[in-house]
């Protein structure tokens, strides 16, 4: 099997106790896989008893949190299971997070997620043009009846072209317009089962008039995202304050002031490449290529909105605050299956998620 990873993947090393929002104590649900639970059932002595008493067996296996944290953290926020049983007997979630993996025929794609602050730092501070590294690994090919090799080959080709667009010197708003055009056109080809035409597609920028910008459109996107499952109460409070403040007075002035600062650390282009790598090929299975593009663009719009709100509130935006916005947003949106499913439905049926309305926002914000 061939492993594909982003070029920055090997830079990641867990900072463990130094992490400010450690995934072991930040209120995260810590899921356990069946093999790990079965092993824990066999562990002898007091530690084995403690393991079994700490597992919640209802619905899905997970640890019962204590004060929002894993019950096996010591005073230095390090893992008792690691020390007592070794890393080979930690759950899959514990050993793999923030890594994610998807399988496409004889390819396995693995990356690191923005919900981890160290992973987010690596992604946003990277200075190289985005590219994928391939390695041969000793792992059996993943079989899925819904996998279509020809469609996958076409979407891979389109994705590589979009990476080239993002790595080019084209204006950022123009790049996002190319993504939106590509989303609409490739979706039409998928709907017609014209997979060979996908292989021939070359993204290009077409200058055109856009719809007049409507501030209500951004609020409609916020309403969609704010109606979903809440994983952290800080998110609810932040969005409440943002929507009550940012769009109540002189939004254009705040946006203009933020853009004039030209903060060098925002890395919005790097976020797009992250989303392209992580999500675009998933349309091989659900055939919703356009929805993946809308997801990327909507996420980018809201993350910039969060940045502008902090700029208005504090008179400035620090690199640390920007990183925290991305970290908080990713944790709420990307790490809830229910939220991702809800958004997938919205991208299919909600009028706000279309090329024309999203492009009018993009042209105003970026």
Model region roles, listed by residue range:
Residues 2-19, 52-91, 108:
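Immediate flanking context of iron-sulfur cluster ligation sites
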Residues 11-19, 129-134, 271-275:
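Short, compositionally biased low-complexity segments
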Residues 171-366:
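Hydrophobic, aromatic-lined core segments that form the binding pocket/scaffold
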Residues 1-47:
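General N-terminal leader/first-domain-start detector
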Residues 77, 84-180:
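Internal, well-ordered alpha/beta segment that forms a basic, Gly-enriched binding/recognition surface
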Residues 17, 22, 26-27, 73, ...:
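General secretory precursor processing signal
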Residues 16, 20, 159, 296-300:
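Short runs of predominantly hydrophobic/aromatic residues within well-ordered alpha helices
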Residues 41-52, 127-135:
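Compact, glycine/acidic-enriched structural inserts
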């Amino acid at each position: 099997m061939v492993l594909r990873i982003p070029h920055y993947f090997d830079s990641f090393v867990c900072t463990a106790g130094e992490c400010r929002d450690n995934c072991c104590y930040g209120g995260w649900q810590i899921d356990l896989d069946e093999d790990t639970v079965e092993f824990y059932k066999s562990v002898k002595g007091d530690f084995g008893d403690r393991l079994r008493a700490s597992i919640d067996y209802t619905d899905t296996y997970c640890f019962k949190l204590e004060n929002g944290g894993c019950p096996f953290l010591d005073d230095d926020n390090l893992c008792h299971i690691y020390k007592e049983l070794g890393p080979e007997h930690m759950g899959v979630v514990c050993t793999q997070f923030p890594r994610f993996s998807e399988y496409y025929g004889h390819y396995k794609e693995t990356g690191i997620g923005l919900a981890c602050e160290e992973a987010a730092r690596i992604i946003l501070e990277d200075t190289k043009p985005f590219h994928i590294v391939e390695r041969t690994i000793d792992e059996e090919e993943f079989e899925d009846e819904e996998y279509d090799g020809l469609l996958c080959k076409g979407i891979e080709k389109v994705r590589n072209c979009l990476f080239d667009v993002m790595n080019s010197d084209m204006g950022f708003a123009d790049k996002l317009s190319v993504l939106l055009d590509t989303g609409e056109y490739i979706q039409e080809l998928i709907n017609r089962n014209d997979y060979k035409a996908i292989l021939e597609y070359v993204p290009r920028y077409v200058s055109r008039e856009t719809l007049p910008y409507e501030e209500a459109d951004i609020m409609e996107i916020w309403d969609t995202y704010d109606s979903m499952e809440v994983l952290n109460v800080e998110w609810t409070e932040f969005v409440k304050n943002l929507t009550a403040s940012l769009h109540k007075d002189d939004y254009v002035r705040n946006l203009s002031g933020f853009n004039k600062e030209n903060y060098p650390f925002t890395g919005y282009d790097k976020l797009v490449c992250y989303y392209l790598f992580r999500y675009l090929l998933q349309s091989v299975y659900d055939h919703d290529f356009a929805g993946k593009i809308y997801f990327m663009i909507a996420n980018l719009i809201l993350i910039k909105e969060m940045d502008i709100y902090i700029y208005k509130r504090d008179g400035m935006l620090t690199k640390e605050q920007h990183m925290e916005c991305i970290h908080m947003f990713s944790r709420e949106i990307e790490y809830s299956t229910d939220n991702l499913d809800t958004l997938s439905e919205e991208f299919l049926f909600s009028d706000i998620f279309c090329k024309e309305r999203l492009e009018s926002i993009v042209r105003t914000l970026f």
